[in-house]
Amino acid sequence: MASKLTTTSQHILENLGGPDNITSMTHCATRLRFQVKDQSIVDQQEIDSDPSVLGVVPQGSTGMQVVMGGSVANYYQEILKLDGMKHFADGEATESSSKKEYGGVRGKYSWIDYAFEFLSDTFRPILWALLGASLIITLLVLADTFGLQDFRAPMDEQPDTYVFLHSMWRSVFYFLPIMVGATAARKLGANEWIGAAIPAALLTPEFLALGSAGDTVTVFGLPMVLNDYSGQVFPPLIAAIGLYWVEKGLKKIIPEAVQMVFVPFFSLLIMIPATAFLLGPFGIGVGNGISNLLEAINNFSPFILSIVIPLLYPFLVPLGLHWPLNAIMIQNINTLGYDFIQGPMGAWNFACFGLVTGVFLLSIKERNKAMRQVSLGGMLAGLLGGISEPSLYGVLLRFKKTYFRLLPGCLAGGIVMGIFDIKAYAFVFTSLLTIPAMDPWLGYTIGIAVAFFVSMFLVLALDYRSNEERDEARAKVAADKQAEEDLKAEANATPAAPVAAAGAGAGAGAGAAAGAATAVAAKPKLAAGEVVDIVSPLEGKAIPLSEVPDPIFAAGKLGPGIAIQPTGNTVVAPADATVILVQKSGHAVALRLDSGVEILVHVGLDTVQLGGEGFTVHVERRQQVKAGDPLITFDADFIRSKDLPLITPVVVSNAAKFGEIEGIPADQANSSTTVIKVNGKNE
């Protein structure tokens, strides 16, 4: 039997349109990133239905991001093993796929969308090196805190051991322009190694020997202003754009037979001087200009920046618009020696981590395994790694009320950051492990603690879901729990139990207790080709589930089925069944039919807020019912008087156990009208 990893990987690939629809595939810390030929044939809803998938995010006209969380690398490697995908490697694409992926340069994307996409995809592959370097910095700052060394002392005053340790993180930032040049060129479809070689030329000992930063020297009879390009990001970005156009022009005029030799030759010959004379100084000027503007705002009032930054990040990160700020942080470290954005950014991160911690605690209380796994993964990735995407896509973007719990934490934490005027003296990812990199670290600790606990307590006090979402989640948990209990009962049942069940079903004199026991033990499974017809549990008009004015039901998140616009006022059992859940408020009931199909009947939308008023419940949990037995009676006029929709979803909650499930609309449905057909699964 295929593993869960393989099954999910196959599911993703199939619903992306298969290997023939994919032109390139990469991954970052949390997301699988695909470029596809035809985005219209991608079934986003079906991909998102897999429990292992945290979210699906379209990017531009050809990009698709599938959010997997911290195990993304495992899924990436598994997809590479599937038929038709073995030729893909991280970051590589065929020439034709590059043209498709980077068509945005020629007008398929708006320039703003493409600019942010360009920055995001340039920095994404470097994330691993930056994460590793940031933790090495943290260890050295801790050594400074305990008096073992002076983190900011010149290297010639450091012991040899610490000089070596400093080289381990400085290598990433010193040679960052080379990495940026490579990934930026790759994103644009230019040669990544030429993209790396251009900034590398400006970091060689020979170039540095020309003079100090700010000096002017004469090269080719022209004045050249020298700059320190170590740690710079804007010069290699701009140089990569120039390289794209130079390569494109050269390929038009150089015969294909000799392009491999002369395109890189002329590219280097043109782009290195162009970068040294013009593009490099211009890029440094752009970075300094943006940095100076933000510094002026910070100098005018740290409060403004400290509040705005954490309030903006929850909206920037889902769109990938936070990457430009990362570039500015690195620029600040290089030019000012410190950064004033990372501290306030920590307020957003820890408000986010506090929120998912609250979700984790609630999921433990409710025994909600699915949310416990999602929230635990997000919490650990955030607190230990400073990565917010698992929390963002696993919780925040799935439940709209979460932002009302998140933003107060961002605001409160941002205010504290403003009071202490937090600065970072190294580029790090804001996690518990990197607290010592902030100054004053105690003020920063107070700020992130405030952000964390404000959002966490708001979740614990007010929940993170709407009333409907909460009740449906609890209903599903209860149904799953009951299913586990029934499986145990089935496993412990004697071989004679199914026979007894058959006898009880056929004989008129079988007792109720025996019938209840054998109904649980039998728990039949539909064979391939077998069909169960489910009649309407109440009178009314049966309409497609997609027409329900609730995104959770309409998208089939709680299972496929049908919706009834009621004309009657009584919910009845559509078949012999066991009641597995009844809401105290009376607005919902879940049944396990003797066929093994589990259905949820939800009377109206947002009716939970009535607190049971207008509903009369006739059954209780674990009760055996016969077809036609009344389950719930409701006062339709009273519910309408509260301006609540009466449309009633009827969904199959254990759909994964069966094959195709079809909802059948009907103008006048009643207890003899088939509204759902459930087919046995083909093994």
UniProtKB/Swiss-Prot annotation:
Signal peptide start and end residues: none
GO cellular component terms listed in the entry, alphabetical order: plasma membrane
Notes concerning its domains: The EIIB domain is phosphorylated by phospho-EIIA on a cysteinyl or histidyl residue, depending on the transported sugar. Then, it transfers the phosphoryl group to the sugar substrate concomitantly with the sugar uptake processed by the EIIC domain. The EIIC domain forms the PTS system translocation channel and contains the specific substrate-binding site.
One Pfam family recorded for the sequence: PTS_EIIA_1
The protein's role, per its UniProt record: The phosphoenolpyruvate-dependent sugar phosphotransferase system (sugar PTS), a major carbohydrate active -transport system, catalyzes the phosphorylation of incoming sugar substrates concomitantly with their translocation across the cell membrane. This system is involved in mannose transport.
A biological process term (GO) from this entry: phosphoenolpyruvate-dependent sugar phosphotransferase system
Gene3D superfamilies: Glucose Permease (Domain IIA), Glucose permease domain IIB
Membrane topology of the entry: Multi-pass membrane protein
Domain PTS EIIC type-1: residue ranges: 117-476
Protein localization: Cell membrane
SUPFAM superfamilies in the cross-refs: Duplicated hybrid motif (SSF51261), Glucose permease domain IIB (SSF55604)
Name of the featured protein: PTS system mannose-specific EIIBCA component
Residue ranges annotated for the PTS EIIB type-1 domain, each copy included: 1-89
InterPro entries attached to this UniProt entry: Dup_hybrid_motif, Glu_permease_IIB, PTrfase_EIIB_Cys, PTS_EIIA_1_perm, PTS_EIIC, PTS_EIIC_1, PTS_IIB_1, PTS_Sugar-Specific_Components
